Swiss-Prot record:
Protein name as annotated: Alpha-acetolactate decarboxylase
Molecular function GO labels: acetolactate decarboxylase activity
Gene3D superfamilies to which the protein is assigned, alphabetical: Hypothetical protein, similar to alpha- acetolactate decarboxylase, domain 2
Family per record: Belongs to the alpha-acetolactate decarboxylase family.
CDD domains referenced in this protein's UniProt entry, alphabetically: acetolactate_decarboxylase (cd17299)
Organism per entry: Lactococcus lactis subsp. cremoris (strain MG1363)
Disulfide bonds: none
């Protein structure tokens, strides 16, 4: 029997949308569950990028910091990435065109997938969510997020593809973060163009959904689920 690949998700994107930003899991604990992934930091201070078992923070001032094990996160998703499909992208395409090609390799539409794209990007457009106090709705914070575009940059996109039925737990479709080859630029991917690269698609067999069970704010939060889903559509 082949080894089971488990996606570990700490907290839900819906809780993040509601303004629950306090970090309650350490990077050290998170990395026990996977070597590739995405998330955010305490007080939603930038974007979390997990690549090859190391964690990085893309900050709003356009800097990248490698994170120590004691730093805490309010939300993250990581997986021990194992490529099931690998293909070369040898001509220029947009993000949407590449995503269509990726999905052509899926066996059905109801399983999570891990995504890793390494290559050269004529355009990479990202954002970094700015630091905010808990209680402020994520969609409101995102209206003032810094965005940056770099041209002819080499690096890696990491992320998760989520089935529609799990929208709210995460964002349905692609949730992708980028980090440059020299670890000086990165963030939450908004759009890109790639002209040469390698795409890896990993199968995910199980979802391990973990919750901040010691966090009273989470335990007693009164969440408007339909409103949160709409906020995810706007912010992500």
């Amino acid at each position: 029997m082949s080894e089971i690949t488990q996606l570990f998700q700490y907290n839900t994107l819906g809780a993040l949308m509601a303004g629950l930003y306090e970090g309650t899991m350490t990077i050290g604990e998170l990395l026990k569950h996977g070597d590739l992934g995405i998330g955010t930091l305490d007080s939603i201070d930038g974007e979390l990028i997990v690549l090859d078992g190391k964690a990085y923070q893309a900050k709003g001032d356009k800097t990248i910091v490698e994170l120590t094990d004691d730093i805490k996160v309010p939300y993250a998703a990581v997986v021990p990435h194992q490529a099931e499909v690998v293909f070369k992208q040898k001509f220029t395409v947009s993000d949407k065109e590449l995503e269509d090609r990726i999905e052509s390799y899926f066996d059905g539409q109801n399983l999570f997938r891990s995504i890793k794209i390494t290559g050269k990007f004529p355009k990479m457009h990202v954002r970094m969510i700015p630091r905010a106090k808990s209680g402020t709705k994520f969609v409101e914070v995102s209206q003032n997020q810094p965005e940056y575009t770099e041209e002819n940059i080499k690096g890696t996109i990491v992320g998760i593809w989520t089935p529609e039925m799990f929208h709210g737990v995460s964002v349905a479709g692609y949730h992708l973060h980028f980090i440059s080859e020299d670890f000086t630029f990165g963030g939450h991917v908004l759009d890109f163009i790639i002209d040469n690269g390698t795409v890896e698609i990993g199968a995910i067999d199980q979802l391990n959904q973990s919750f901040p069970v010691q966090d009273r704010k989470f335990l007693f939060a009164d969440l408007d689920i339909e409103a949160l889903k709409k906020d995810i559509d706007v912010a992500e």
